[in-house]
């Protein structure tokens, strides 16, 4: 390959020679000499470094060999490459691309064309690496990163916005169906199901309704839930549903979906928010096991705790070292008219007791301060005040004036006795330790929601319509699949290491991998800027990528970028304006 610019032919007459073949004169450089013993003389070893300009015998068109043997010569850059950065960050992309290939995610997008597949996966990679989901910043990301679209074509923010709004419900459902169809439906797995919500100020999102927000800002909300396979450590499905629908009532619809997917031998690990008699009965009907957390102050379990209080809290046989907690198991009916008995696992933690006692005392102190300020005034106090205090009101001029209050000592003392205790209810027989370890394994799914909001840029979705909202949630789920794999592989590798380095977290690892860069040479080809460091080798090794493999993959991307298509031009000089409307 010869570059499309001219340089002066080197004047080193001892090593520069010309070789004319047909109508072209090639410039050759003698880089070494080899002695031939039989003939007793040296043979020059030459390589072509360019071809002479027919109109000027002092100038030539160089090739990559010229850069190799004359590195000090400054070559002009080409105008063609101005649309792409001369420094391409390739490290994090290598890991994401390998996970995409290992999962064969493109195969689950069977109805999509190559452009659509590439653009969807590019948006997922963009949200992981940049921790952002704003369409108007995607071209900035693609300017200095490889992409998965054919020809490494970079699309404008307007195209991205249109693309997100055109992702149809059939395409989203087809992906989830295919993603779950390929699994072993007879394998025993436990699924963690959890939900969160996003505050919404957009007027055109159909699912935005007033409900029970995690963080109340006085705005409608949209609910969002994820089901996570705890054994294989992979997200299985996601749901978005109206904000007025309470979590406890949504669970039965999820169970029906898993029945439809054909899962035969599964159990659910659930937070206390999903505990209800109807949900328990429905899981029994589906023959699905369950593991549900219950607070020690729960009305149906606190008597069990008080009955067993003092019988296991210091017994070493009951100690669970992993969580510095004592636990015991007993069998009992969940409801008086239950046909089967459940297994109740009772736990006590000194640290939890201290924290809960402090929290309760502080809450009582704040309530008393509030009531003291309201004395002699008309006051409508929340219901929780009457739980802990007897309030005395006097009627004056038709108004209820707060006169005084008195602690309900028996109620407070009972709750103090329950501080530090909690319970887990399971449908299948297991030890207290097994039940706790199984429940605690759902921490990964909780981290998924943290990732969704903090590390994928989805604290704010920046949409104003239902179609774009659904498209961005779908992209976020694809990104969660990939990022979850990054998290589990790093955690697995870190557990094997004697030292626990702080660069083995997902944000730190991605930042370190972003330092692996391809630098564009004057001829348009890309080369690694420097050797891969020991830290980067450790991170890449977590994903089965060794140094040689990383170099080969990076250089292959560099060759593809040499022939990359021109970026799409933005028709509107002001770009696409997105509103920060869904938090």
What are these regions (language model features)?
Residues 1-192, 196-202, 225-237, 242-244, ...:
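Dynamic "connector" segments at or just before major functional cores
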Residues 435-462:
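Short amphipathic alpha-helical "interface-anchor" segments enriched in bulky aromatics
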Residues 37, 145-152, 170, 184-186, ...:
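Secondary-structure transition/capping motifs at alpha-helix termini
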Residues 220-222, 240, 289-438, 510-583:
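An anionic, glycine-rich sequence signature occurring as long contiguous blocks
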Residues 32, 205-230:
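Acidic, metal-ligating active-site segments
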Residues 240, 245-256, 260-263, 274-318, ...:
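Catalytic or ion-translocation cores adjacent to nucleophile or general acid/base/metal-coordination motifs
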Residues 117-118, 130, 152, 156, ...:
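Secondary-structure capping and boundary motifs in well-ordered enzyme cores
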């Amino acid at each position: 390959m010869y570059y499309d610019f001219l340089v002066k032919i080197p004047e080193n007459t001892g090593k520069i020679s010309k070789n004319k073949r047909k109508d072209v004169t090639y410039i050759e450089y003698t880089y070494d000499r080899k002695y031939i013993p039989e003939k007793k003389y040296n043979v020059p070893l030459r390589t072509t470094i360019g071809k002479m300009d027919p109109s000027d015998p002092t100038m030539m068109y160089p090739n990559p060999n010229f850069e190799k043997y004359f590195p000090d010569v400054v070559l002009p850059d080409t105008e063609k490459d101005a649309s792409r950065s001369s420094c391409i960050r390739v490290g994090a992309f290598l890991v994401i691309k390998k996970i995409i290939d290992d999962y064969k995610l493109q195969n689950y997008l069977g109805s999509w064309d190559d452009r659509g597949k590439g653009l969807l996966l590019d948006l997922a990679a963009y949200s992981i690496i940049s921790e952002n989901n704003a369409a108007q910043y995607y071209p900035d990301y693609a300017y200095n990163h490889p992409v998965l679209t054919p020809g490494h074509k970079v699309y404008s923010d307007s195209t991205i916005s249109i693309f997100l709004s055109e992702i149809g419900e059939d395409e989203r459902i087809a992906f989830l169906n295919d993603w779950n169809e390929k699994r072993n439906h007879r394998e025993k797995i436990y699924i963690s199901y959890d939900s969160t919500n996003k505050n919404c100020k957009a007027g055109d999102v159909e699912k935005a309704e007033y409900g029970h927000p995690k963080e109340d800002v006085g705005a409608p909300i949209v609910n969002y839930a994820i089901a996570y396979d705890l054994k294989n450590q992979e997200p299985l499905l996601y749901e978005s549903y109206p904000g007025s629908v309470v979590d406890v009532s949504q669970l039965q619809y999820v169970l029906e979906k898993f029945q439809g997917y054909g899962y035969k031998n599964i159990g659910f690990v659930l937070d206390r928010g999903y505990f209800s008699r109807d949900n328990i009965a429905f899981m029994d009907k589906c023959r699905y096991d369950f593991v549900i957390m219950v607070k020690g102050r729960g009305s149906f379990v606190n008597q069990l705790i008080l009955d067993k209080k003092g019988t296991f809290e210091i017994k070493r046989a009951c100690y669970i070292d992993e969580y510095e907690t004592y636990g015991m198991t007993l069998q009992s009916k969940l409801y008086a008219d239950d046909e089967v008995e459940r297994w109740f696992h009772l736990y006590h933690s000194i640290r939890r007791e201290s924290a809960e006692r402090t929290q309760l005392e502080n809450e009582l102190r704040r309530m008393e301060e509030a009531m003291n300020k309201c004395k002699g005034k008309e006051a409508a106090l929340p219901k929780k005040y009457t739980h802990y205090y007897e309030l005395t009101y006097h009627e004056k001029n038709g108004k209820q004036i707060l006169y005084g209050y008195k602690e309900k000592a028996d109620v407070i003392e009972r709750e103090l006795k329950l501080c530090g205790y909690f319970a887990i209810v399971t449908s299948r027989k297991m030890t207290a330790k097994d039940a706790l370890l199984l429940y605690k394994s759902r921490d990964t799914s909780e981290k998924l929601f943290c990732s969704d909001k903090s590390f994928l840029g989805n604290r704010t979705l920046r949409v104003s319509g239902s179609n774009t909202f659904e498209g961005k949630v779908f992209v976020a789920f694809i990104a969660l699949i990939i990022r979850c794999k990054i998290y589990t592989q790093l955690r697995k590798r870190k557990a094997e290491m004697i030292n626990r380095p702080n660069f083995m977290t997902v944000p730190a690892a991605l930042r370190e991998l972003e330092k692996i860069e391809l630098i564009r040479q004057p001829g348009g080809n890309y080369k690694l800027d420097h050797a891969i460091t020991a830290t980067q080798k450790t991170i890449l090794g977590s994903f089965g990528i060794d140094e040689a493999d990383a170099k080969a993959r990076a250089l292959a991307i560099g060759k593809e970028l040499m022939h990359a298509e021109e970026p799409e031009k933005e028709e509107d000089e002001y770009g696409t304006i997105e509103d920060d409307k869904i938090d």
